[in-house]
Amino acid sequence: MKAIVFAYHDIGCVGLNALAEAGYDIQAVFTHTDNPGENRFFSSVARVAADLALPVFAPEDVNHPLWVERIRELQPDIIFSFYYRNMLSDEILSLAPQGGFNLHGSLLPQYRGRAPINWVLVNGETETGVTLHQMVKKADAGPIAGQYKVAISDVDTALTLHAKMRDAAQELLRNLLPRMKEGPLPLTPQKEADASYFGRRTAADGEIHWQKSAFTINNLVRAVTEPYPGAFSYLGQRKLTIWRSRPLDLVHNKLPGTVLSTAPLTVACGEGALEIITGQGEAGLYVQGDRLAQEMGIVTDVRLGNKPSNTLKRRTRVLILGVNGFIGNHLTERLLQDDRYEVYGLDIGSDAISRFLGNPAFHFVEGDISIHSEWIEYHIKKCDVILPLVAIATPIEYTRNPLRVFELDFEENLKIVRDCVKYNKRIVFPSTSEVYGMCDDKEFDEDTSRLIVGPINKQRWIYSVSKQLLDRVIWAYGVKEGLKFTLFRPFNWMGPRLDNLDAARIGSSRAITQLILNLVEGSPIKLVDGGAQKRCFTDIHDGIEALFRIIENRDGCCDGRIINIGNPTNEASIRELAEMLLTSFENHELRDHFPPFAGFKDIESSAYYGKGYQDVEYRTPSIKNARRILHWQPEIAMQQTVTETLDFFLRAAVIEKTAAPKDELNA
């Protein structure tokens, strides 16, 4: 059986040798060049391939059409990936009739993603293992061919556990590879409900937070000790690295980080205490804990902790245009919860942000972006991160006011983009799930999916193409003029303060607000084309947390990226959304304030939106970028979001009804 192998690390060497022992005809080996900045403690796949007289390559982008064509010419029967660090495209995987199989360092579906050995230790797991699974478009999500369990002892470190995993991989492959040559193995689908995902770790993640328990801190030490950079803390400005430690079940009344004794060197934790067995000063030697205390002048009752800043760091200034909107006001709330940020905002109203007006870190001006261009340019120059959230984003307006959509959504925002280029400011731009249009992929991928829209006479696509063109302009400015940017694409975010009932009364609102208005007024719920269209609904709090991490942009991880923000597990049709709303409405404590339910009414899209409308059957995001780059995973179930959104609007409607007579008297 002819095989193509993608491999790196010790596990890659194990996989390559196992294939050779099993008699596979290895056509080519793809690996990575060594990173001079990485502490390489593992064997070289390139050397093993050379010893086996196999052709070996290390392309920068194996998914490039030139490499895809070279692999096609080799006509592989099967593809294997052993700790190869890049995802393989569907095009490459389709070249092998038997498919592609990846060896992952955990018991899937748990610990999908990066650095599973480190993560299981950080989280104090007692068992892990290796999994051989079929590769699919979603990382580490394909059906399982086999697994081999590995016990984790209390004294295991990342290095000792790696050795166990290497042996486990060898045993698993010796068992499976000969059988796979005979024919396809039975595969077991993964249970998505049990899946967990973890992203890459950096050296900065090794910083110790002493308020955690001694058990938790010791797990961190085990997870990142040699050959990794190590767990660390500070004594004033001086860094110390802890290589080995022991948790102590010790009762104390000291603040976390306080040194309880120097021989042995013992530090108070939020729960228990940590004995430092070996460690190292920033420019010192690897020594025992008591010797470390002597060398660094550590004495009893001194506190270890974060490195104190020499200067008072200025808050990051975030400019939000459209700050009173749905995303704008929720994002403002999240930013103001963190004292690293201050917010400058512009909008034509302030009802949703009135709760922030007394906050000294919030600066608001009422105005229109079409008029206040000088104010906007000045504040782009003044601020650090720019979010132009002003747009017409309600479907009925795409056909009712297409030119206004273009003028505001494209022309006005293009001015802002150019000012960001002029003053070298980072822009976080709200693209949209609408740019994917009628894409026929099962999941819409930021980097590979085609953006497909309808004919010119379907004016509803003017919003989609306006946003898409801005995406392309921003990308070009990034490539040609160094603009720092991130494009984020929300997928049907919903929650309290989404639109308002007045907007729904004139049809200018999103679906859930329109449905709630029907319930509040006792009018039939209109289901456009029967409400069969499916969407993936995302809770505003999940969405805002992802957006906050984009603004935070740790280590520049979001620069030049496009990131979908949605919840694929919350997929439902508009009819299902309406039925869920109706159930919550009938059970709500304010139900008696509103008329009886008037039923569902199916209506054609042309009658509701106009002749220029065209809909899509589904819109499902791939969120691999958000998981990998932001370490983000949506958590809030659709039912909770529906309940909270409905409650917000019902209470607002009751207040509106009770206030109406008073208003009439005053008139």
UniProtKB/Swiss-Prot annotation:
<keyword id="KW-0046">Antibiotic resistance</keyword>
<keyword id="KW-0511">Multifunctional enzyme</keyword>
<feature type="region of interest" description="Dehydrogenase ArnADH">
    <location>
        <begin position="314"/>
        <end position="667"/>
    </location>
</feature>
<feature type="binding site">
    <location>
        <begin position="432"/>
        <end position="433"/>
    </location>
    <ligand>
        <name>UDP-alpha-D-glucuronate</name>
    </ligand>
</feature>
<dbReference type="InterPro" id="IPR045869">
    <property type="entry name" value="Arna-like_SDR_e"/>
</dbReference>
<feature type="binding site">
    <location>
        <position position="114"/>
    </location>
    <ligand>
        <name>(6R)-10-formyltetrahydrofolate</name>
    </ligand>
</feature>
<keyword id="KW-0444">Lipid biosynthesis</keyword>
<feature type="active site" description="Proton donor; for formyltransferase activity">
    <location>
        <position position="104"/>
    </location>
</feature>
<dbReference type="GO" id="GO:0046677">
    <property type="term" value="P:response to antibiotic"/>
</dbReference>
<dbReference type="InterPro" id="IPR036477">
    <property type="entry name" value="Formyl_transf_N_sf"/>
</dbReference>
<feature type="binding site">
    <location>
        <position position="613"/>
    </location>
    <ligand>
        <name>UDP-alpha-D-glucuronate</name>
    </ligand>
</feature>
<feature type="active site" description="Proton acceptor; for decarboxylase activity">
    <location>
        <position position="434"/>
    </location>
</feature>
<dbReference type="InterPro" id="IPR036291">
    <property type="entry name" value="NAD(P)-bd_dom_sf"/>
</dbReference>
<feature type="active site" description="Proton donor; for decarboxylase activity">
    <location>
        <position position="619"/>
    </location>
</feature>
<dbReference type="Pfam" id="PF01370">
    <property type="entry name" value="Epimerase"/>
</dbReference>
<comment type="similarity">
    <text>In the C-terminal section; belongs to the NAD(P)-dependent epimerase/dehydratase family. UDP-glucuronic acid decarboxylase subfamily.</text>
</comment>
<dbReference type="InterPro" id="IPR005793">
    <property type="entry name" value="Formyl_trans_C"/>
</dbReference>
<dbReference type="InterPro" id="IPR021168">
    <property type="entry name" value="Bifun_polymyxin_resist_ArnA"/>
</dbReference>
<keyword id="KW-0808">Transferase</keyword>
<feature type="binding site">
    <location>
        <position position="460"/>
    </location>
    <ligand>
        <name>UDP-alpha-D-glucuronate</name>
    </ligand>
</feature>
<feature type="site" description="Raises pKa of active site His">
    <location>
        <position position="140"/>
    </location>
</feature>
<dbReference type="GO" id="GO:0016831">
    <property type="term" value="F:carboxy-lyase activity"/>
</dbReference>
<comment type="function">
    <text>Bifunctional enzyme that catalyzes the oxidative decarboxylation of UDP-glucuronic acid (UDP-GlcUA) to UDP-4-keto-arabinose (UDP-Ara4O) and the addition of a formyl group to UDP-4-amino-4-deoxy-L-arabinose (UDP-L-Ara4N) to form UDP-L-4-formamido-arabinose (UDP-L-Ara4FN). The modified arabinose is attached to lipid A and is required for resistance to polymyxin and cationic antimicrobial peptides.</text>
</comment>
<comment type="subunit">
    <text>Homohexamer, formed by a dimer of trimers.</text>
</comment>
<dbReference type="InterPro" id="IPR001509">
    <property type="entry name" value="Epimerase_deHydtase"/>
</dbReference>
<comment type="similarity">
    <text>In the N-terminal section; belongs to the Fmt family. UDP-L-Ara4N formyltransferase subfamily.</text>
</comment>
<feature type="binding site">
    <location>
        <position position="398"/>
    </location>
    <ligand>
        <name>UDP-alpha-D-glucuronate</name>
    </ligand>
</feature>
<feature type="binding site">
    <location>
        <position position="492"/>
    </location>
    <ligand>
        <name>UDP-alpha-D-glucuronate</name>
    </ligand>
</feature>
<comment type="pathway">
    <text>Nucleotide-sugar biosynthesis; UDP-4-deoxy-4-formamido-beta-L-arabinose biosynthesis; UDP-4-deoxy-4-formamido-beta-L-arabinose from UDP-alpha-D-glucuronate: step 3/3.</text>
</comment>
<dbReference type="InterPro" id="IPR050177">
    <property type="entry name" value="Lipid_A_modif_metabolic_enz"/>
</dbReference>
<comment type="pathway">
    <text>Nucleotide-sugar biosynthesis; UDP-4-deoxy-4-formamido-beta-L-arabinose biosynthesis; UDP-4-deoxy-4-formamido-beta-L-arabinose from UDP-alpha-D-glucuronate: step 1/3.</text>
</comment>
<keyword id="KW-0560">Oxidoreductase</keyword>
<protein>
    <recommendedName>
        <fullName>Bifunctional polymyxin resistance protein ArnA</fullName>
        <ecNumber>2.1.2.13</ecNumber>
        <ecNumber>1.1.1.305</ecNumber>
    </recommendedName>
</protein>
<feature type="binding site">
    <location>
        <begin position="526"/>
        <end position="535"/>
    </location>
    <ligand>
        <name>UDP-alpha-D-glucuronate</name>
    </ligand>
</feature>
<keyword id="KW-0441">Lipid A biosynthesis</keyword>
<feature type="binding site">
    <location>
        <position position="347"/>
    </location>
    <ligand>
        <name>NAD(+)</name>
    </ligand>
</feature>
<dbReference type="GO" id="GO:0099619">
    <property type="term" value="F:UDP-4-amino-4-deoxy-L-arabinose formyltransferase activity"/>
</dbReference>
<feature type="binding site">
    <location>
        <position position="393"/>
    </location>
    <ligand>
        <name>UDP-alpha-D-glucuronate</name>
    </ligand>
</feature>
<dbReference type="InterPro" id="IPR002376">
    <property type="entry name" value="Formyl_transf_N"/>
</dbReference>
<feature type="region of interest" description="Formyltransferase ArnAFT">
    <location>
        <begin position="1"/>
        <end position="304"/>
    </location>
</feature>
<dbReference type="GO" id="GO:0016020">
    <property type="term" value="C:membrane"/>
</dbReference>
<dbReference type="GO" id="GO:0009103">
    <property type="term" value="P:lipopolysaccharide biosynthetic process"/>
</dbReference>
